Amino acid sequence: MAEFKRYLELDISQQHDFIYPLLFQEYIYALAHDHGLNRSIFLENAGYDNKSSLLIGKRLITHLITQMDQQKKFLVPDSDSNQKKNLGYNTNLYSQMIFEGFAVVMEIPFYLRLLSFLEGKERVKSHNXXXXXXXXXXXXXXXXXXXXXXDIQIPHPIHLEILVQTLRYWVKDASSLHLLRFFLHEYPIWNSLITQKKSIFSFSKKNQRFFLFLYNFHVCEYESIFVFLRQPTSHLRSISSETFLERISFYRKIELEVFTKDFKSILWLFKEPFLHYVRYRGKAILASKGTSLLMNKWKYYLLNFWQSYFYMWSQPRRIHINQLSNHFLDFLGYLSSVRLKPLMLRSQMIENSFLIENASKKFDTLMPITPMILSLYKAKFCNVLGHPMSKPAWSGLSDSDIIERFGRIYRNLSHYYSGSLKKMSLYRIKYILRLSCARTLARKRKSTVRAFLKRLGVGLLAEFFTEEEQVFYLTFQKVSFTSGELYRRRIWYLDIICINDLANYE
């Protein structure tokens, strides 16, 4: 670890040249082991200790480089178990170690840039970025003023080679990139490690950290187009995406105003009325005050950018342009829309009175009940119509564990959907979980639900299904809320982004 810290203290001009030798250092794989691999599954053979196993992983890289013609002897498919035994180690396990080591090494240049940024050595590229925890609150405050929104499914690269080519603009060590390219191409099942699942990548549990690093870097590069949003009023656009300059000098040319001085014939300034960009996983929202014509221009601008810069074919149907007043927006597990709230005002001037109609925009967020019932149906809490069922798999647990599990599920859902404007859908989920819990307890005692509740009382389940709105009301007792106001009150909790599974029903 001390050697790793000494490396980080090197001058930035030297660090790119020393990434490749780090792949042969044992402490790199120790870091990868501590961060990514599970200690309980690390050793398949009791005769190996951690140090010798890490050394074998390091030797595997050396053999793969010096004997590339014989790489099949070291990377054996899963079906050939006899040859695995002859080699004396689990090939898939050590290939996982190598990819985890790659992830540690490739993250070093970006970590150093982060340190430089924190020390004030680098200028911020974008001043309008917000934290992920503020995404929900920003959508509620900013989207209410928007008129149209583009629902974007972020495209994925056709080939992992595209990710390596993009990565070379940031990692200047050619040897490391060549070795990375070799592993991606020569690894027997590399193309099965990453699979397409709708709009996002679905990673296998093996090598998850490494491929998440590549994918996050890909998304970061995709979002580089929004460097134009640094200036809130005027931005640059091009007639053809072929005029995009190389990424390596992209920011420098913008800062030197080369666009406005040397490319007046193909680039011009245009007024951008209002733009908000929010991304979560494989989806993004681009909202604007502008007209549908402006949003369509942005749509085809993005499509051309993806195809020419990332060499990806992205179908136009991956970007849906909707009017927020007429369509619901599916994002972060919420159904959101902007509706007009009519308001009638009476104004009187001396003898005459006037009725003035006014309408204000209101941002609505609703809990999607159909996907929620489908999720509960898949988890065997109810049938496809939403009728509660018992959970036989939990019948062997104690009563307190059963009630705690059901209560924890509901509290998580209540916590996540506390930003919903109407709670009727949440109350229906509460009914399903409470009755499913009661039926599970009754099944355990081989009794009916009515007899069980009559004997123990309904209050047995009440404390485990306490809603967070009630806790909020008890905490701030000096603030008076009626039951109707509490029902319509929207509370955003900043940690809901951590509950990933609740926001991805796809």
UniProtKB/Swiss-Prot annotation:
InterPro entries reported for this sequence: Domain_X, Maturase_MatK, Maturase_MatK_N
Subcellular location as annotated: Plastid, Chloroplast
Single Gene Ontology MF annotation: RNA binding
Top-rank taxon, per record: Eukaryota
A cellular-component GO term for this protein: chloroplast
Keyword Plastid appears in the UniProt entry: yes
Function: Usually encoded in the trnK tRNA gene intron. Probably assists in splicing its own and other chloroplast group II introns.
Protein name in UniProt: Maturase K
Species, as recorded: Phyllodoce caerulea (Blue mountain heath)
Gene, per the UniProt record: matK
